[in-house]
Amino acid sequence: MDFIKRKRVIFMESEIKTNKIKIEKINENDYNRIFVMSDIHGQYDLFLKMLDRIDLKREDLLVIIGDICDRGKKSYEIYMKCMKMIKLGYNLKFILGNHEDMLLEDLENDYPIRYETEYSVFRNSKYFENKDMKDWHEENFLEEIEWLVKWLKNCPLIISGNENIFVHAGLDLKKVLEKQEKETVLWTREEFWLMENVELEEYKGKNIYFGHTPNINGRISKKTDRIKGIDCGAFFTHFLGCIEIKSQEEIYVYENEHIQFPEVLDKVFREIWNEEVAEFIDSEKYKIKSRKSGIEKIRILKKLDREEKKVLKKFFEKYKKMFSKNI
């Protein structure tokens, strides 16, 4: 079977299409402890350090709410570690992030290893050792990624329990879970927690945990009593946060144990953000609202994501001396 046909078979065999909202139900009482983390972005060493810190048992549950891949150097290793843990009997659930969705879209509709997301995932994989992207074996590559494609295609976009909801980017609290739009749960930057006063009965009394939007001070952000943002910006802060939801204990690991993040950085970042991309983002959001095509919306959202990454990199470079201040 030639490369193109084989690739189509791999994607057709997956049960879940990525343009549908899949919701997985859980019962929190089935687990002793429930840990939640997000947006690891290829920071494999931080992930291992966090696993060591939380000392995950088979009676526990680990929920990763999206964006293992891209930006960092060891995305593939994290996926492999997760799969190994599952095979060893650990309870690990993964929610698709926008970067996984981009990865699947590009792998399905184009040749692999063409864009940054694919490269970031597979650059350290067995069949892709040549960094210039010129020499890789298509058939061997497909054999290697088949398990990952099937796993990701069957991951949910939302996990809902009796007391908690987990989602990558956010929710529209005016819509029930089954009516959420893929664009919202994967990409939104809206401050949806401000909509609590109009939320539906489905959300009352439930905690919501989300990632996607990094907290620049490297800490889990309590938006309301029930809504928490847990993306600590690991790909550029080198801080990874995790919360055990039953005890509400927050756990943090750092690449450098002597790094601290002054609270002023959050304010500084917002000033740079407004200066660099506010006008651009506003214009692009207008385009999104004026487009009926879902494909065109995703293209614009990808463009926004690339622009955000540029700003974050510029921010880190400009203020790196503040990041390395000794405690």
Question: What role is predicted for each listed range?
Answer:
Residues F3-K81:
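N-terminal active-site segment of His-dependent metallophosphoesterases
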Residues K22-D30, D55, I86-K87, L157-S160, ...:
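A short acidic-Thr-Gly-centered motif at the start of a beta-strand
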Residues M37-S38, V63-G66, K93-N98, V167, ...:
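Active-site neighborhood of phospho(di)ester-bond hydrolases with catalytic His/Asp-centered motifs
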Residues H41-L46, D70-K73, E100-L104, L173-K174, ...:
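Active-site environment of divalent metal-dependent phosphoester hydrolases
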Residues R71-S160, T188, F192-V198:
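Active-site neighborhood of divalent metal-dependent phosphoester bond hydrolases
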Residues K175-Q180:
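Cytochrome P450 core scaffold surrounding the K-helix E-X-X-R motif
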Residues L186-Y254:
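Conserved beta-sheet core of the metallophosphoesterase superfamily
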Residues K285-I295, R299-K321, K325:
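Basic, mixed-charge low-complexity alpha-helical segments
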